[in-house]
């Protein structure tokens, strides 16, 4: 391995017709680590501002994957409902802010993506551990946690409200369903 035949970059070569050792890239070649042509997807930003939207539709599969990844990477500090009282915090680590405070409820999805990617304060970055699609799944799940704590009647579909209104309530002498 110490002595091997090779050409140095930009060295002349009698082997190739053009006399160069360096070969041109094959058409449509993407340099390793440089496919990041979708700025919104890879940075969470539109221009210099954090993106107010998601780069792809948020499906139940995206939310389920985000939930799974959140439980692994985020819940140790942020806890399972996003109040910032995870097991690590209960053992002395600095408490992160709750996702339910106004500042974070009003933050753009791109902000959360950026924080997961680059870290913030004492939070480390997770760019190496969490792939880009999973980071967006985590952001979607954080939004779901926020909505779960601050939902209004206007957030409930009319059909669901109707079901709730027509559901019989236990009266005198009736037992509630134990289901």
Segment roles from a protein language model:
Residues 2-61, 130-141, 164-165, 171:
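Periplasmic c-type cytochrome electron-transfer domains
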Residues 5, 81, 120, 146-149:
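A general structural signal marking secondary-structure boundaries and capping sites
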Residues 10, 39, 75, 121, ...:
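A generic secondary-structure boundary signal that marks alpha-helix termini
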Residues 19, 84, 92-95, 130, ...:
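Residue-level signal for alpha-helical context at structural boundaries
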Residues 60-83, 96, 111-112, 117-118, ...:
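Sequence/structural segment immediately N-terminal to covalent heme-attachment motifs in c-type
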Residues 71, 103-109, 124-179:
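Flexible coil segments in periplasmic/lumen-exposed cytochrome c-class electron-transfer proteins
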Residues 79-105:
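Histidine/lysine/aspartate-rich catalytic loop segments that bind and position anionic ligands
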Residues 98, 122-125:
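Conserved beta-strand positions that form and line the central face of beta-propeller blades
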């Amino acid at each position: 391995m110490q002595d091997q035949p090779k050409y140095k970059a930009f060295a002349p070569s009698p082997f190739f017709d053009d006399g160069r050792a360096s070969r041109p890239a094959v058409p449509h070649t993407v340099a390793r680590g440089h496919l990041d042509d979708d700025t919104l997807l890879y940075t969470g930003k539109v221009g210099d501002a954090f993106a107010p939207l998601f780069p792809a539709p948020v499906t139940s599969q995206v939310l389920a994957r985000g939930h799974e990844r959140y439980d692994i990477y985020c819940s140790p500090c942020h806890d399972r409902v996003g109040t910032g009282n995870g097991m690590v915090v209960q053992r002395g680590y600095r408490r992160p802010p709750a996702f339910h405070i106004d500042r974070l409820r009003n933050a753009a999805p791109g902000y959360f993506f950026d924080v997961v990617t680059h870290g913030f304060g004492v939070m480390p970055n997770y760019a190496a551990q969490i792939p880009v699609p999973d980071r967006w799944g985590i952001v979607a799940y954080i939004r779901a946690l926020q909505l779960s704590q601050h939902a209004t009647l206007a957030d409930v579909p009319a059909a669901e409200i109707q079901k709730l209104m027509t559901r019989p309530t236990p009266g005198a002498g009736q037992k509630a369903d134990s289901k």
